[in-house]
From Swiss-Prot:
Core subunit of respiratory chain NADH dehydrogenase (Complex I) which is composed of 45 different subunits. The keyword Chaperone does not apply. It is a multi-pass membrane protein. It catalyses: a ubiquinone + NADH + 5 H(+)(in) = a ubiquinol + NAD(+) + 4 H(+)(out). It comes from Oryctolagus cuniculus. Core subunit of the mitochondrial membrane respiratory chain NADH dehydrogenase (Complex I) which catalyzes electron transfer from NADH through the respiratory chain, using ubiquinone as an electron acceptor. Essential for the catalytic activity and assembly of complex I. It is found in: Mitochondrion inner membrane. The lineage of its organism: Eukaryota, Metazoa, Chordata, Craniata, Vertebrata. Disulfide bonds: none annotated. The chain crosses the membrane at residues 22-42, 60-80, 92-112, 113-133, 147-167, 196-216, 224-244, 257-277, 284-303, 308-330, 351-371, 375-395, 439-459. Keywords: Electron transport, Membrane, Mitochondrion, Mitochondrion inner membrane, NAD, Respiratory chain, Translocase, Transmembrane, Transmembrane helix, Transport, Ubiquinone. Its main location: mitochondrion. Its EC number is 7.1.1.2. This is NADH-ubiquinone oxidoreductase chain 4. One of its GO terms (molecular function) is NADH dehydrogenase (ubiquinone) activity.
């Protein structure tokens, strides 16, 4: 893993010592080279090549998320160029350095071998994200959004620390690799049920579970483009990754404790999808659609079957790329129209036809059109939940229908209709923006053709 972490850290001095006109080019090109090198390193024929270290390792669960994390840094830097045009040179450098440090923390989080180390890095990702949201957000509400984001995630994860320290004392080790070999089953007592709640709450807030999701639309709407991209694509996946890892520790209690959370997720999935149908703010709509998709992932993880885990992994990766792409498209609209209200951005298809094509593809992947990887993830989850309980098919089917409705509503509102008078003099699409869309869609296309890249050789 150091082959990824050290070059990424070295990007920070590269940015600070670059000539003013070369900052963006250097940061983008070198981060893209690092991500491509990491992809080739992670694509090893045997599992043991990266597992020599006792601190960092990669396995079938963390590798897809590591790939997504490294791939996203050049895309965030590409997307942020216009947003930071009028900023001073030092602020541009600080911004890029924060993105790079966030990437380092995320790579280390996904490859940590030990729970306490994972927890420390899990919390460390908050700091750069919070600075990015509160300093470079668009409106003054960003401070309120930052406060929500910080307090929800911190309050959720404090009980986790206490639970981890207790488990460390009782088990002797919290190493992921050792825990798989230890057969200590936890009894379903009151105290152990509370411990399960303490362990899961941090990840359920991060996912977020319906009811604990209020920080997410605020943070997404107020964050700058890179903040929205990293929040949607990776930070929500930290919750899913942590839940999958911690179910090893809490194996028998999860079956006993999962019912209320499964029902809340299934209900929340319908509710947040329905909320999307009456949104006027474009970024808010995409944020609520993220909550709806993540509810599916929570259901899959709590069911705990191999199929549901495969579905959760596939949907997390697919959603990461799709939601990031949608935020980029929303940002390209915002840069031209200076408003996130969908009614003001109508009729853009006649002015920007290529951008309308990207919107169409993004909306179709969001509603899980065959043969995309989104559909594969959703199908695996629907089948796993159906085998758990036949009644879930009603809620899942309703959710699929509403997802299609709000995706098409978003597409038709922004692209169709007669354009408003203030959109006459907007700038055409840049090559940078089109490259950004292609770099989002290329991995989605690749995964749709060959899902075994992330689902393993068993698929």
């Amino acid at each position: 893993m150091l082959k990824t972490i050290i070059p990424t850290i070295m990007l920070i001095p590269t940015v600070w010592w670059s000539k003013p006109h070369m900052i963006w080019i250097n940061a983008t090109v070198y981060s893209l080279l690092i991500s491509l090198t990491t992809l080739s390193l992670l694509n090893q024929p045997s599992d043991t090549n990266l597992n020599f270290s006792t601190t960092f390792f990669s396995d079938a669960l963390s590798t897809p998320l590591l790939m997504l994390t490294t791939w996203l840094l050049p895309l965030m830097i590409l997307a942020s160029q216009h947003h930071l045009d009028k900023e001073t040179l030092t602020r541009k450098k600080i911004y890029i350095s924060l993105l790079i440090s966030l990437q380092v923390f995320l790579v280390m989080t996904f490859s940590a071998t030990e729970f306490i180390l994972f927890y420390i890095l899990f919390e460390a990702t908050l700091i750069p994200t919070l600075i990015i949201i509160t300093r470079w957000g668009n409106q003054t509400e960003r401070l309120n959004a930052g406060t929500y984001f910080l307090f929800y995630t911190l309050m959720g994860s404090l009980p986790l620390l206490v639970a981890l320290i207790y488990l460390q004392n009782s088990m002797g080790s919290l190493n992921f690799l050792l825990l798989q070999l230890m057969n200590k089953s936890i009894t379903t007592s009151w105290s152990n049920s509370l411990m399960w709640l303490a362990c899961m709450m941090a990840f359920l807030v991060k996912m977020p579970l319906y009811g604990l999701h209020l920080w997410l639309p605020k943070a997404h709407v107020e964050a700058p483009i890179a903040g929205s991209m990293v929040l949607a694509a990776i930070l929500l996946k930290l919750g899913g990754y942590g839940m999958m890892r911690i179910t090893i520790l809490l194996s028998p209690i999860t079956d006993y404790m999962a019912y209320p959370f499964l029902m809340l997720s299934l209900w929340g999935m319908i509710m947040t999808s329905s909320i999307c149908l009456r949104q006027t703010d474009l970024k808010s709509l995409i944020a609520y659609s993220s909550v709806s998709h993540m509810a599916l992932v929570i259901v899959a993880i709590l069911i705990q079957t191999p199929w549901s885990f495969m579905g959760a992994t596939a949907l997390m990766i697919a959603h990461g790329l799709t939601s990031s792409l949608l935020f980029c498209l929303a940002n390209s609209n915002y840069e031209r129209i200076h408003s996130r209200t969908m009614l003001l951005a109508r009729g853009l298809q006649t002015i920007l036809p290529l951008m309308a094509a990207w919107w169409l593809v993004a909306s179709l992947t969001n509603l899980a059109l065959p043969p995309t990887i989104n559909l594969l993830g959703e199908l695996l989850i629907i089948m796993a939940s159906f085998s758990w309980s036949n009644l879930t098919i009603i809620l899942m089917g309703t959710n699929v229908l509403i997802t299609a409705l709000y995706s098409l509503y978003m597409l038709s509102t922004t692209q169709r209709g007669k354009f408003t008078y203030h959109t006459n003099n907007i700038s055409p699409t840049f090559t940078r923006e089109n490259t950004l869309m292609v770099l989002h869609l290329a991995p989605l296309l690749l995964l749709s053709i060959s899902p075994k890249i992330i689902l393993g050789l068993m698929f």
